[in-house]
């Protein structure tokens, strides 16, 4: 059998970006044939990616990209399994690259991103290799692309766990940044009341009526009480109705009016929002890992 040297391992690692021990194993299996070892690694990395695909990816980051003139921007959420990997440099670089591709290439949906070119490979090939290198499932969950009416302001908060884009027409760069930070803090569901789904308003109304009834309020007053409750709810969940976080005596609508500005649209992403996280049994995980190691 050919001797597997450190320089051979280094060369294969540089070509494939695979972990060092995986490179050594592949070279051993290939009897020192570098090309064959590379093929073996491609198969193994693909296999790892397939095995990881069923695992929950509730951690991750949001990443943004925007043009210098603020006219084009994108916000993406890329998920992984643990917060540790969410801080990995390769994972961060991949997420940033995906955000730029979304903005500049305008894919139709998440599936279409996988076919885009990224450094001579498809995004899906790069993702698969990254899964093999890191050992965790990685998924591109969602994206929003804004072709701005005005100029886009962005804000990333809390270790890239919350991301905001705001298309601000008029105003200033400072106002855009303030609005983006406000959205991250206040988390509005919509820009204005007309964008809130009717079924959500109906639910709030029914709850208000039942609460008032249980409190012993007269039946003749229930509708009026419900109206007031719904109006309060709409102010709480719409950007224009919310009090400005830096001055709660001023609503966002009033703030915009005072600056002769308007918001064309905004998007808010919170990492893992709506994903049910798997509750781990640490002892069971250790036992499973020990059993798997014993079988090798």
UniProtKB/Swiss-Prot annotation:
Residues of the signal peptide: none
Gene Ontology CC terms: cytoplasm
InterPro entries associated with the record: EF-Ts_dimer_sf, Transl_elong_EFTs/EF1B, Transl_elong_EFTs/EF1B_dimer, Transl_elong_Ts_CS, UBA-like_sf
The keyword Transmembrane appears for this protein: no
Record's keyword annotation contains Protein biosynthesis: yes
Highest taxon of source: Bacteria
Compartment annotation: Cytoplasm
Molecular functions per Gene Ontology: translation elongation factor activity
Keyword tags: Cytoplasm, Elongation factor, Protein biosynthesis
Region listing for Involved in Mg(2+) ion dislocation from EF-Tu, in residue ranges: 82-85
Main location, first listed in the record: cytoplasm
CDD domains, alphabetized: UBA_EF-Ts
Known role: Associates with the EF-Tu.GDP complex and induces the exchange of GDP to GTP. It remains bound to the aminoacyl-tRNA.EF-Tu.GTP complex up to the GTP hydrolysis stage on the ribosome.
Family from the record: Belongs to the EF-Ts family.
Name under which the protein is recorded: Elongation factor Ts
């Amino acid at each position: 059998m050919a001797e597997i040297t450190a320089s051979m391992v280094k060369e294969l690692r540089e070509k494939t970006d695979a972990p060092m021990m995986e490179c050594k194993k592949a070279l051993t299996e290939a009897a020192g044939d570098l090309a064959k070892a590379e093929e073996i690694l491609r198969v193994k990395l693909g296999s790892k990616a397939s095995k990881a695909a069923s695992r929950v990816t509730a951690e991750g980051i949001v990443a943004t990209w925007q043009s210098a003139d603020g006219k084009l921007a994108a916000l993406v959420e890329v998920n992984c399994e643990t917060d540790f990997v969410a801080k990995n440099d390769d994972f961060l670089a991949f997420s940033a690259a995906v955000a730029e591709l979304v903005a500049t290439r305008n894919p139709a949906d998440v599936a279409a991103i996988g076919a885009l070119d990224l450094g001579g490979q498809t995004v899906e090939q790069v993702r698969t290799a990254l899964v093999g290198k890191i050992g965790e499932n990685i998924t591109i969950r969602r994206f929003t692309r804004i072709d701005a009416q005005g100029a886009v302001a962005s804000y990333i908060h809390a270790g890239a766990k919350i991301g905001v884009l705001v298309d601000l027409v008029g105003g200033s760069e400072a106002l855009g940044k303030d609005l983006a930070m406000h959205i991250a803090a206040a988390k509005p569901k919509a820009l204005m009341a007309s964008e809130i789904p009717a079924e959500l308003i109906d639910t709030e109304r029914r709850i208000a009526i039942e609460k008032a009834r249980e409190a012993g309020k007269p039946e003749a007053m229930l509708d009026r009480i419900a109206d007031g409750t719904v109006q309060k709810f709409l102010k709480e969940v719409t950007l224009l109705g919310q009090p400005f976080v830096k001055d709660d005596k001023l609503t966002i609508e009033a703030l915009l009016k005072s600056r002769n500005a308007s918001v064309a649209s905004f998007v808010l992403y919170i990492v893992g929002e709506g994903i049910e996280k798997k509750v781990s049994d640490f002892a069971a995980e250790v036992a499973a890992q020990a059993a798997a190691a014993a079988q090798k």
